[in-house]
Amino acid sequence: MLLTEKIAVVTGGAQGIGQAIATTLAREGADVVVADLDAERCQETVDLVQQSGRKALAVSVNVGEWEQAKGMMDRVLKEWGRVDILVNNAGITRDGLLMRMKEEDWHAVLQVNLTGTFFCAKAVLPSMSKQRSGRIVNIASIVGAIGNMGQANYAASKAGVIGLTKTIAREYASRNITVNAVAPGFIDTAMTQHLSPEIKEGLLNQIPLKRLGQPSDVADAVCFLSSEKAGYISGHVLHVNGGMHMAS
């Protein structure tokens, strides 16, 4: 197994891609903290992790609030002693064309997607620095690389995540901490399953591989970047989007 006895924190781990990441890390030997605003669904992921024979802890948290992000990390360090892997997956959307976008929708998306990533990284880096090891994997998006109509706030937040990833990677390389990002494209989740056939066909036409990705595709990429096999990779954006990044 790639992650035997490692301790991982996965934000936004209650469902979808986050749940796939949490369960994949567990199958590779990691104990997993499932952090999410949705406490009930957190427990569902915890149950799946425990079915893999690993320890799991559910933490209800709003990562966009510093005291909550720090409190979560302090609790994990107190109860489990260390954090080896942080996956910043928590994210929201509030889509709308720029001229119609409400200011509160702009701020809400930036607060969770970008500031939340900053807060969680800031909270865990002192302990990772002390142990002189760690893996941080931030979930970005193809939208952060190429933009998308109706998603100015989301695109800005994910572009910010990419820049933040590269900066933290530079600042903490001397501490043997690697920091990378995974940029998913259109993934087959509950949201895409409710799209009309016409809209789904339009999405597929943008993807060179002509299929939606699976949550497991993203989870496998995160697992690799969290492992010793990726020990010489830092500051990288791994595109998991069926080739959309080159088609743009």
Listing of model-derived features with the role each one plays in the protein:
Residues 39-40, 60-71, 103, 216-217:
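The beta1-alpha1 cofactor-binding region of Rossmann-like NAD(H)/NADP(H)-dependent oxidoreductases
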Residues 97-98, 105-110, 203:
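Substrate-binding pocket helix/loop in short-chain dehydrogenase/reductase
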Residues 121, 157, 165:
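Active-site helix of classical SDR
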Residues 126, 170-174, 231:
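Alpha-helical segment proximal to the catalytic Tyr-Lys
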Residues 141:
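Residue(s) in the substrate-gating loop at a strand-loop-helix junction
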Residues 146-149, 223, 234-248:
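Short C-terminal tail/terminal secondary-structure segment
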Residues 181, 204-229, 233, 242:
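C-terminal helical subdomain
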